[in-house]
Amino acid sequence: MKPERRFSRDAILGATEALASQSRPVRFQDVDAAGTIFFPKVYEYFSDAYLDLLLAAGLDVPGSLARRESAAPLVHSEADYLAPLRFGDEVVVEVVLARVGATSTAYAHRILRLDGTVAVIGQTVHVWVSAKTFEPVPVPDALRAYLAGKVGVILD
């Protein structure tokens, strides 16, 4: 996916519905010496919500990996930290936008405090590949069908 195919900050902040959502605490092991979330932990949070989306779409992610059928490695990621998250904060992690191409998917993510403050926004791009050859393969039909018609989804 080319850079211009990613999502604008305004689009991420203004998204009205979540494609996947997960509530969780910021745990002690998630913060750094400054007492705020350690920067790579947000990617773990994004990944967990993304996995929830794939499972909701009916994809057998563990089985597909075990059978070496397909995988969707991350090829791009970015995050903007807008407000601090600290140990003990309760947050909601959302996948709010998606763009589905022939062999790739892009997602926009948000992490919000329970008071509605958006603390982190980010984007990830995944390319679907054969787990055996690592050559690109089409985005699974089940995922494309699940996302079709949802608010915030662009099917290319």
PLM regions and their residue ranges:
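Terminal targeting signals and extreme-terminal segments of soluble enzymes
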Residues: M1-V92, A98-D156
